[in-house]
Amino acid sequence: MKNVTDNLVINNDDLNIKSMKDLKNPVSYGKDTSADFKVQSPGNFKYENSKYEIKSDIIGDHFKSNMLGAVILALLNGIEIKDSLNAIESFAGVKRRIELIGISKGVLIYDDYGHHPTEMEATITALKQQTESKLYVVFQPHRYTRTMEYFSSFKDSLKLADFAIVTDIYPAGESPIPGISSKNFEEESIKYLKSIRYVPEYLSKKVQNGDIVLTLGAGDITLLGPKILKYLNEY
C-alpha cells in the first residue's frame, strides 16, 4: 500500500504514546490542551477555531476516539472533515463489535469479540452507560496462556458488570495448563458455568425488562447470543 502522508496520528491522552520519544511528524488529538485536535467531550472536537461533532449510532467513547483518528488521517490525505463525518454517520459498524443480536422481553442481547482486558473494559463501560438496569456479561476466556497472563485484569474488567458468567476456557489449539481454570474467577458477582449451553436457562431466571446481556470472547461464544434470544422467546 502506497503511503500518501508522512504524518503520524496519535491519541495525546494515551500515556503509553506520550512516553514515546522521537515520533516523526505527530498530529495529535485528545483532551490535552496541547493537542492539535482538541476533544471537548466524546465525539466533539475543535480544530482551527471550528467545532465539529461525530454523529454515530455505534456505542462507546473508545469508538468515537478511533473515528476521530480516522477523520484526521483522512484530512491529511485531502478528504474534508465534513465529508468524513458524513461517511461516519452512515456507517453501521461491523460484526462482533458491540453487535446487537436482538431483543426479547425488553432484554437486549449484544455480542463482542473482546478477549483482552483493555477492550473488555471499554466495551463493558460503554454498555453500562446505556442502561440504568443491570448488565450481565458472559465471558469465554480464549487460550490458557492468555488467561494465565491476564487473570487479574480479566477479573477486574468483569467486576465492572453487575453480574458475570465465565465459561470454560476456549483452548484454540492449546493444551491445558495445570491450575489455570475458569473456576478461579468465581466469587459473589462472578458465576462459573462449565459450558455455554447452560447459560440461556441460567440467565432466563435472572434477567428482567431493560437489562443488557453481553457475550464476550474470541471462541465459539459468538454462537451463544442467538441461543439466549431463542430461549427467552420460548420460555
At which residue positions do the language-model features occur?
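Acidic, Mg2+-coordinating active-site environments of NTP-dependent enzymes
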Residues: M1-I109, E132, K183-E188
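A short, aliphatic-rich alpha-helical micro-motif
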Residues: K2, L158-K159, V207
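Structural beta-sheet core signal
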Residues: I10, S28, V137-F139, V166, ...
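Short glycine-/acidic-enriched loop or helix-start segments at secondary-structure transitions
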Residues: K18-K21, K38, T147-M148, S175-P176, ...
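Active-site beta-alpha connecting loops in nucleotide-dependent enzymes
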Residues: V94, T118, I124-S189
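Switch II (G3) loop of P-loop NTPases
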Residues: I109-H115
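Short acidic-hydrophobic, aromatic-tinged amphipathic segments that line or gate anion-handling sites
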Residues: K191-V199
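A glycine-rich beta-strand to alpha-helix segment
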Residues: Y198-Y231
